[in-house]
Swiss-Prot record:
One of its GO terms (biological process) is DNA transposition. GO terms for molecular function: DNA binding; transposase activity. This is Transposase for transposon Tn1546. It holds the Pfam family DUF4158. Required for transposition of transposon Tn1546. Belongs to the transposase 7 family. It comes from Enterococcus faecium. Keywords: DNA recombination, DNA-binding, Plasmid, Transposable element, Transposition. It comes from the Bacteria.
Length: 988
């Protein structure tokens, strides 16, 4: 059936891919393996070709679901698998069907025997109704097409022509969009519509070169009071449109997110070209999502300002101590001399003043005392007493913060919100005195020491306000206080499955522990005690392990890579052809098809040949950090506008993740990577990047030198593929991000065990990884300082008693076991990200029973791990090798990301992640290209001389000396490389 071009969803290549029969063991086993009944029906035919033809017809109706006449080609391996089951020659299929009637008779019999249904108007209506409902939830055409085919297959409906399915999906999606747009548009008033028109047509008053929409989209600069006020100005502008009254609560979250992302990409001129309902709806949904982002960004700036306030206090104290160090030392010497004189006078019953003046002149003594009084800091001093003058820097924005943002809390935190209301009221009324009955119980002891004036009753306005704003920050971060209209700072319980939902679903949970606390604690105690008993019996037999005098120490591991392996690896790399990075990327695109994942965000169309070259250039521009402008200058025939367009519309987060998954999955199916690992273990490590622009997401960390930066946190499999990456704050603990990568990568890797450095672990992460079924194995620095725990009494293990310094609180685990499982289940099912919830659990104000219980469960796992770690040198080596692979990956990453002195120049975290993802794709492309050509080199070595297969375990596919990263960038789309026509080795 021919369909209107506007309703085509697929390219010819995509249609072929949908109808292709994969040579997949799972597909063969599930759909093409015949039962005894199947064989009885097949064998009713006398001729071999008819038996095989009938069997093949049955097989393809099961999968992919089209009639035999629609299938253009069937892989030889599939024909062989089917023919072997029925005992005929595969070649007999060439003679089927001799008569066309035979083919149709067979199809009719299959329909009758197996209850297959022909696709008629009735099936069309049923499927369309199903698709329409799905399209209200997800507008992705490819997703809907997959769902459509799965639905028909599940209901044993024979698939019609794929163009019919395309038209049905197109119409269902169009009808769903029309319904959605009409619903949203109808709930808008004429005044709201006029305001929406205004933001895409009117220029911003103070920025004549920008529309109001362009102004609203501006990324924030560095966290400062001025930036805060600019964000609030935009937030209040959107609030002034009263869009909260628009009816969108019944719309599916996924669909809202898709439309919001589209809204963020469209320029004002594009909106003006849309039909009214579509224009108003997408704008409204985008602006409502933008209010959440602006609310979160505003509070994030407050978070940073409080951190900056406290940091400046600490630095001021350090500076005082540095400046006064010499004088303080002088006073200590005076005190020592005077003290010794006084002791002598008392013991020898001498005149105190004469003895005193013998060591220090009286006037000098008086001056020293006066100077000491000036140098003296308050008893139990910290730096908070130095913050009095810093109060006014907060006042630049905090009245606006308290006026614009609305806070809610549980009853336990009402005193804090009462204090917020008091300060808000004082700001509005202009009163300067804090009421005497203002709540103070929620304020920490540190702040309370500075809360009152010298009379002991009058509350100091400056310190009260700073204390309240600091406590507000902590409680919001912890989830005890929520912000109305926020996405990131909601009530803690809102992130989890409700107790009712948990009780209904916990029978099907994917957690790795028993739902019964008694079963859980019995099993863990048994594992715990088994390790302790073994170590107690064998502690003297472990090489490189010392447990003397209550100190646990390990000898440094010797390198285990033989020199022969290094020479062998070098000899293989010498055989690899030199190649430009542009050609390498095109080779890998031809071989893997990863570029096809860059579908257009608006119309879902895959890139054509010309667009593919533009995408490759944009990938290099971002992944090498030279930028799109420089890339356009260095690439003949391409312009900046072309690169900017594909980066905006094709290289969005979901497309980048899918392209990355294609590469990782392809690499995982090759043979050579299995010498390096089986794809079940991985490591993660951060690569700190300097930021060359002011950004809300930039942090300073003295550990990494001067300047502010962000961290690319990368996950590396044991096969040298980079399967997940994200941007995190430099001062964020790596540990809280570990589970994001393990749970949310989209590859075929089945990661069971994960390694990190010391920064990658906390007790709570140990607990959660166990609950979610992962083995967690960090390399712990200063192992001798680690606190080991026991469930039973440490005295039961006298040889180990000195290193067992704590006891697990099983009572708190028992009391909170259900809630801990509910938390873990919520993370596993994606209700909340692990990093978000772990950040809240790590906040000091949320050290409640749930956080404590998870920490205690983690201490069990950490202790078991450390016992295994010191008992097993092979485990220590495995962790070391895993981390070395991540470090090697970072080495390659830095070589590729050479532009702009390796600095990120993007302000928003989304654009920073786009650069990091492009870098990851290039890394994986290099790993694949090297692996393929190293495989060819290995095969050549096997044919031409002696060969030690064990040396392959020590290789890496991350070498880059043969790859030209520099120069003018040409992309040759005419030279098509395949697995059967790789570039020739360099043998001379």
């Amino acid at each position: 059936m021919k369909i209107a071009r506007g309703r085509e969803l697929l390219t010819p290549e995509q249609r072929q891919a949908f109808m292709q029969i994969p040579e997949d063991e799972w597909i063969l086993g599930t759909y093409f393996t015949f039962s005894k009944r199947d064989l009885e029906i097949v064998n009713k035919r006398r001729r071999e070709e008819n038996r095989l033809g009938f069997a093949v017809q049955l097989a393809v109706l099961r999968y992919p679901g089209w009639p035999y006449t629609h299938i253009k080609s069937i892989p030889d391996s599939v024909i062989q698998y089917i023919s072997k089951q029925i005992g005929v020659s595969p070649s007999s299929l060439d003679h089927y069907p001799q008569r066309e009637n035979t083919l149709w008779d067979h199809l009719k019999e299959i329909r009758s025997e197996y209850d297959f249904v022909t696709f008629t108007l009735s099936e069309y209506r049923m499927t369309f109704k199903y698709l329409h409902q799905l399209a209200l939830e997800n507008g992705d055409a490819i997703h809907l097409l997959h769902e459509c085919i799965d639905f028909l297959r599940k209901n044993k409906i024979i698939l019609p022509a794929i163009t019919t399915l395309e038209r049905m999906v197109w119409e269902a999606r169009a009808m769903a969009e029309k319904k959605l747009f009409n619903t949203v548009s109808k709930s808008l008033t004429n005044e709201q519509k006029e305001k929406l028109e205004g933001i895409i047509t009117s220029q911003h008053p103070s920025e004549s070169n920008k529309t109001i929409l362009g102004w609203l989209k501006e990324p924030p600069g560095h966290p400062s009071p001025e930036t805060f006020l600019k964000i609030i100005e935009r937030l209040e502008y959107i609030r002034g449109m009263d869009l909260e009254t628009v009816q969108i609560s019944h719309l599916h979250r996924n669909r809202l997110l898709q439309l919001s992302r589209l809204g963020s990409r469209y320029e004002p001129y594009a909106f003006r070209d849309f039909q009214e309902n579509k224009r108003y709806s997408i704008l409204t949904i985008y602006l409502l999502q933008l209010t959440q982002e602006l609310t979160d960004k505003a509070f994030e700036i407050h978070d940073r300002q409080i951190l900056s306030l406290l940091s400046k206090g600490r630095k001021a104290q350090e500076e005082i101590q540095k400046q006064n160090g010499k004088k303080l030392n002088e006073k200590v010497i005076h005190f020592t001399n005077i003290g010794q004189a006084l002791i002598k006078a008392r013991e020898e019953k001498l005149d105190v003043f004469k003895v005193l003046e013998s060591v220090i002149e009286w006037n000098t003594f008086v001056s020293s005392v006066e100077e000491a009084q000036e140098l003296a800091r308050p008893a139990d001093y910290d730096y908070l007493d130095l913050l009095q003058k810093r109060f006014y820097s907060l006042r630049k924005y905090t009245p606006t913060l308290l006026r614009v943002l609305e806070f809610h809390s549980t009853k336990a935190n009402e005193p804090l919100l009462q204090a917020v209301e008091i300060i808000r009221g004082m700001n509005e009324s202009g009163k300067r005195k804090v009421p005497d009955d203002s709540p103070v119980d929620f304020i920490s002891k540190r702040w309370k020491r500075h809360l009152y004036e010298d009379d002991g009753t009058t509350i100091n306005r400056h310190y009260y306000e700073m204390a309240v704003l600091t406590e507000l920050r902590e409680h919001v971060r912890a989830g005890d206080v929520s912000i109305v209209g926020s996405r990131q700072y909601r009530d803690f319980e809102e992130y989890l499955f409700s107790e009712d939902t948990w009780n209904q679903s916990k029978g099907n949970t994917r957690l790795s522990v028993s739902l019964s606390f008694e079963d859980y604690i019995t099993e863990r105690t048994s594992s715990f005690n088994e390790r302790l008993k073994w170590l107690a019996a064998n502690s003297n037999k472990l090489d490189g392990v010392s447990l003397e005098k209550g100190k646990l120490s390990l000898a440094r591991l010797e390198k285990d890579v033989p020199e022969e392996a290094k020479k062998f690896s070098a000899s293989l790399y010498q055989m690899l052809p030199r190649i430009k990075l542009t050609d390498l990327l095109m080779d890998v695109a031809h071989i893997t098809g990863f570029h096809e994942q860059f579908t257009h965000a608006s119309n879902n169309r895959k890139p054509d040949k010309e667009e593919t070259i533009i995408i490759m250039a944009a990938l290099l521009g971002m992944g090498m950090n030279i930028g799109l402008s420089k890339m356009a200058e260095a690439t003949p025939g391409l312009t900046y506008k072309q690169l900017a367009n594909v980066s905006q519309w094709r290289m969005y987060e979901d497309a980048m993740n899918k392209a990355q998954a294609i590469l990782v999955n392809f690499h995982h199916k090759l043979q050579l990577p299995f010498y390096w690992g089986d794809g079940t273990t991985s490591s993660s490590d951060g690569m700190r990047m300097q930021l060359g622009v002011s950004s809300l997401h930039a942090d300073a960390n003295p550990h990494y030198g001067t300047g502010k930066g962000a961290t690319i946190y990368r996950f590396t499999s044991d096969q040298f593929s980079s399967y997940y990456t994200k941007i995190i704050h430099t001062n964020s603990r790596d540990a809280i991000h570990v589970l994001d990568g393990l749970l949310h990568h989209e590859t075929d890797l089945n990661i069971e065990e994960h390694y990190t450095d010391t920064a990658g672990y906390t007790d709570q992460i140990f607990g959660l990884t166990h609950l979610l079924g992962f083995k967690f194995a960090p390399r712990i620095r200063d192992l001798s300082d680690s606190k080991l725990f026991t469930i039973d009494k440490a005295s039961e293990y006298p040889k180990l008693e000195a290193i067992l310094r704590g006891q697990i609180n099983t009572k708190v685990i028992k009391e909170n076991y259900e809630d801990v499982l509910r938390l873990a289940h919520s993370i596993r099912e994606g209700t909340v990200s692990a990093s978000l919830i772990m950040g809240k659990l790590g906040s000091y104000s949320r050290q409640n029973s749930l956080a404590t219980a998870l920490r205690e469960m983690g201490r069990i796992e950490k202790t078991i791990f450390i016992l295994n770690y010191i008992s097993d040198e092979s485990l220590r080596r495995k962790i070391q090798r895993g981390l070395n692979k991540g470090e090697a990956m970072n080495g390659l990453a830095r070589a590729i990301f050479f532009g702009k002195q390796g600095e990120l120049r993007e302000r928003t975290i989304q654009h920073q992640l786009q650069r990091a993802s492009a870098l990851n794709i290039i890394i994986n492309a290099i790993s694949i290209w090297n692996t393929l050509h190293l495989t060819t080199a290995v095969e050549y070595k096997k044919r031409t001389g002696s060969f030690n297969e064990d040396l392959l375990h020590h290789m890496s596919p991350l070498g880059w000396e043969h790859i030209n990263l520099l120069g003018e960038y040409h992309f040759n789309s005419e030279k098509v490389v395949s697995l059967n026509s790789l570039r020739p080795l360099k043998l001379s």
